[in-house]
């Protein structure tokens, strides 16, 4: 009998409390970058019934109406009714943003390499903190993402589309999804074992109606039919009722959905959150660079699965380590892949910022439904423009080995 394994990932909607916080933090970041691309921003948000607190550190010449940004973001998500216990116009907004610490700023604004006399312009910016970051890609889906997180994101995005269009009028903004995929003995996905959807709803709708709509209009519209069979389980609002939701039901904080933001637990995570941080924070920019590297490695056919780890020291431009793990799927040695990565990609913070053009206000759109593998928006770290340079570098290094 062949050995089969299950793997599960989850996603949450834009109306989930933690995702509201992420979107507010990134909306503030975008508003500042639109006026001051050189700004340093670390904006955190806390949401709960009737209140939003925004706090953190910024260095900018721009003036931004934080109150307006917060309210507009909440309205765009869909919290516009007082009965939700959290609405754009009635919520209390409490900003508390201060100047970035000069001790941190001196290392970011002038890297160790620059202080030691190295004149390269890309040595000017040091990493905003120490830390380790991971990027991942796998050939399970066209976007080179693990199937469980890809399907989970698609389910909650479909829910949001049906809610905002009015096609399912009883839906409210808060929702979660979870997909369990069965893999064969070769680690290839063969079927979906379980789908969980919990969606906030108006009080008068029946559970039978919700179940029917979720299966027919959401699950079957998203998950390819060949992954579904008579044994697939559908668990729809398994508590039996989900009227109270959003910040009225749970408080939310920026940075609490880092696994949803990345690979659904299929790959490792360095622990740093993304939202509210400008690109000098390598928690964000180096994670994007690592995904960029991994995706191009897999797209080039150099591996069917690739995980890239980058690590940095605060105030130092060059990464302290670069590691590529292909889990035995690479066509050449991993040492050659690592050498090729170092040749093709400039992994200093300034190099990443230039390579991916990260001083633009592009972050609000990433703050729900995943930062990686997006097919609905155009993100620079999802481009495949490094396939040829990587292939050429690997060929040259292999000849010289």
Swiss-Prot record:
One of its GO terms (cellular component) is cytoplasm. Binds 2 divalent ions per subunit. Binds 1 potassium ion per subunit. Residues 100-110 are annotated as: Flexible loop. Its cofactor is Mg(2+); K(+). K(+) binds at residue 44. The keyword ATP-binding applies. InterPro entries: ADOMET_SYNTHASE_CS (IPR022631), S-AdoMet_synt_C (IPR022630), S-AdoMet_synt_central (IPR022629), S-AdoMet_synt_N (IPR022628), S-AdoMet_synthetase (IPR002133), S-AdoMet_synthetase_sfam (IPR022636). It holds the Pfam family S-AdoMet_synt_M. It catalyses: L-methionine + ATP + H2O = S-adenosyl-L-methionine + phosphate + diphosphate. Transmembrane segments: none annotated. GO terms for molecular function: ATP binding; magnesium ion binding; methionine adenosyltransferase activity. Its EC number is 2.5.1.6. Homotetramer; dimer of dimers. This is S-adenosylmethionine synthase. It comes from Streptococcus equi subsp. equi (strain 4047).
